[in-house]
Amino acid sequence: MQQIHPAGQATLLADTRNTLGEGATWCDRTRALYWVDIEGAQLWRCRADGSDLTPWPMPERLACFALTDDPDVLLVGLATHLAFFDLRSGAFTRIVEVEPELPTRLNDGRCDGSGAFVFGMKDEGAEPPRAVGGFYRLNADLTLERLALPPAAIANSIGFSPDGSKMYFCDSLVREIFVCDYRPGGEVANVRPFARLTDPDGDPDGSIVDRDGGLWNAQWGGRRVVRYGPDGVETDRVAVPTAQPSCTALDGEGRLYVTSARVGLSDDALADDPHAGGVFVAQTRHAGMATARFAGTPRG
């Protein structure tokens, strides 16, 4: 039996109390953590110690984003479309609308090693959500293509192996993370199970892949982050002192950052979980990779 390394408990870094914190992303150039509050329609940033906490309001819900080569420009995935956002001026440059014919919104996304942005959708037309949303790739030339992956109700856990040959993803309503072969042009093949959640509580949410090829998955409702090795076997576990951890990021020194959410919690639950929606941090034994950046520019 493979040993599970208890990586300790995460502690509160920023008491932001986001409604739906997501999209944790570490920038090695600015030495800062970025994330979103989807339902609060905000982008957030802070330093590794939680200082210099800065929010930016968005014109609609912000679900995901990517760094670019310009530290002051992000690719942002708003609920209905993709755009460039200038942190200095607050200006948006619209790129493309996504799934206008469906009651879906953008959800999770990460860049691949070639600088394309890969993301998935969330159904908002039914409760529980239906598996109708696609997975997409925005190329550096700003063309959009749908990946040949099964549709999802709540697309999540998107990430890539260190060599770029594998893509990870999940539907949060299915308690399993999948992996597929991934080629530079965005071709996907050989979809197969990667890791199944075995605890009685918790659903797979956002993930990050470390330098050693391990995938750190935030497990919504499970109060934990679990690391799965490249073989899909659990190796590490971090307890998170809030009910709904939502997404993960790693810096180059092995610090694990975890966003969380308040949405859906009752007043009694929030009284017992006052820092829900905050950002948490834990030290791990695995360093993060440099975050892949979107290779496109507002000029295409």
Curated annotation (Swiss-Prot):
Transmembrane segments: none annotated. It is an enzyme of class 3 (hydrolase). Gene3D superfamilies: TolB, C-terminal domain. Keywords: Arabinose catabolism, Carbohydrate metabolism, Hydrolase, Metal-binding. The keyword Iron does not apply. It catalyses: L-arabinono-1,4-lactone + H2O = L-arabinonate + H(+). GO terms for molecular function: calcium ion binding; gluconolactonase activity; L-arabinonolactonase activity. Its cofactor is a divalent metal cation. Its EC number is 3.1.1.15. Binds 1 divalent metal cation per subunit. A divalent metal cation binds at E22, N156, D205. Catalyzes the cleavage of L-arabino-gamma-lactone to L-arabonate. Is involved in a degradation pathway of L-arabinose that allows A.brasilense to grow on L-arabinose as a sole carbon source. Can also use D-galactono-1,4-lactone as substrate in vitro; however, the enzyme is probably not involved in the metabolism of D-galactose in vivo. This is L-arabinolactonase. The keyword Hydrolase applies. The lineage of its organism: Bacteria, Pseudomonadati, Pseudomonadota, Alphaproteobacteria, Rhodospirillales. GO terms for biological process: L-arabinose catabolic process to 2-oxoglutarate; L-ascorbic acid biosynthetic process. Belongs to the SMP-30/CGR1 family.
